[in-house]
Amino acid sequence: MRKNKIDIISLGCSKNLVDSEHLIRQFQANGYSVEHNPSRVDGEIVVVNTCGFIRDAQEESIDMILELGRAKKEGKIKKLFVMGCLAERFMAQLIDELPEVDKFYGKFNWKEMLNDLGKSYKEDLSSERYLTTPKHYAYLKISEGCNRFCAFCAIPLITGRHKSVPMDTLLNEVKYLVSQGVKEFNVIAQDLSSYGLDLYGKMMLPELIDQMAQIEGVEWIRLHYAYPTQFPYDILPVMAKHDNVCKYLDIALQHSSDKVLNNMQRHITKAETIDLIKRIRKEVPGIHIRTTLMVGFPGEGEEEFNDLVDFVEEMRFERMGAFAYSEEEGTFAAKHFDDIIPEDVKADRLDKIMEIQEEISNEIQSKKVGNVYKVIIDSVDEVYYSGRTEWDSPEVDPEVLIPVENSKLEIGNFYQVEITDATPFELFGKVVG
């Protein structure tokens, strides 16, 4: 056990990661040595930033807490703190069932942790973070919470109503991160589309991205988690105008069937969804759309699933993920629908939709062979440098693999790369020029 050292373990999404990065910076400013996601826990204090979104994530968080609880009983750590979405959602229950935890903090009161340790939260560092990602890219969380209340989703139950971060705060954070070497900003929120409504009375995502794009040193801006209903169309000319705004949009559509969309409380129709996609592609030529779909939601019969299959084949999304519905405690769907679709049927539907997407992805990727693209290098191993194009977000999208042999590239730098081969999930290339 190392005195005056704190280990922070982040579970779940990139939004959680940003919270951990802000907390690490505060701990450092208060004199602590901090390690993020250590291979071996040896700090006298351990903080677990939990995820509570879906059942698998909840179980992962609980397993981690139990493991660290055993380490505490063995005297390997002195204090165990738990924060984040799981703690926010199930605070009372966790306090009763996990007495080995010294204190639970929710999603928004983690600043109290500093006070409990006899330290103070430093407001002048509110825009500063310790980057846990490679130093050339960062996630920028522009809001917290969601006002949409989709039937299947527990996020509003955890994070509450939509709360935007003031634009000045975000722009200062971007400038700080640029000064630390960040070139690529992945803009994230539960609902990008609603940014600014609560603070400024109107959707301000276009203004925010326009101002970010003008900051010297910002090479790439990528948008994650837009909402299709009340989509801020003014963002499209901003994307088309600025070369450093990636032609990429992550927008979760969930389904195509009007019946299922209505059950999901998405407040959009299939026809409106198709019009949205067509307009995005028309106004931002070359854009790659990433979406997420759900199979097995209550009301999805064979007709509705076949509608989804036809939709995927027609829309030909450049990037797509999918998952099978699982009932979440407290949601509208859990209260009002019976989850009666057998799990094996859900699994078969998921496999089918992803097989179709794999074929589409293979065709789209193959068309890149012979072309030259701007690629940022993320990492290297004994065989390949791993990089990404503007259409590829960290962790979730295809990589560009460049042989180490006869190449000497710098991590975090951009290169012109000719694509020589492709699979649905990878591109292979060589540096040119």
Predicted regions and their residues:
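Conserved, mostly hydrophobic/aromatic
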Residues: 150, 170, 187, 223, ...
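Conserved SAM/AdoMet-binding glycine-rich loop
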Residues: 79-84, 89, 94, 179-303, ...
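Active-site proximal loops enriched in glycine and acidic residues that flank catalytic Cys/His/Asp
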Residues: 189, 225, 253-255, 291-295, ...
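Proteins enriched for Cys/Gly/acidic motifs involved in redox and nucleic-acid/cofactor modification
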Residues: 1-195, 234, 249, 271-278, ...
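Terminal RNA-binding accessory module
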Residues: 333-433
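Short acidic, glycine/proline-rich loop/turn micro-motifs
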Residues: 261-264, 332-336
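Glycine-centered loop/turn positions within well-structured domains
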Residues: 111, 148, 193, 258-259, ...
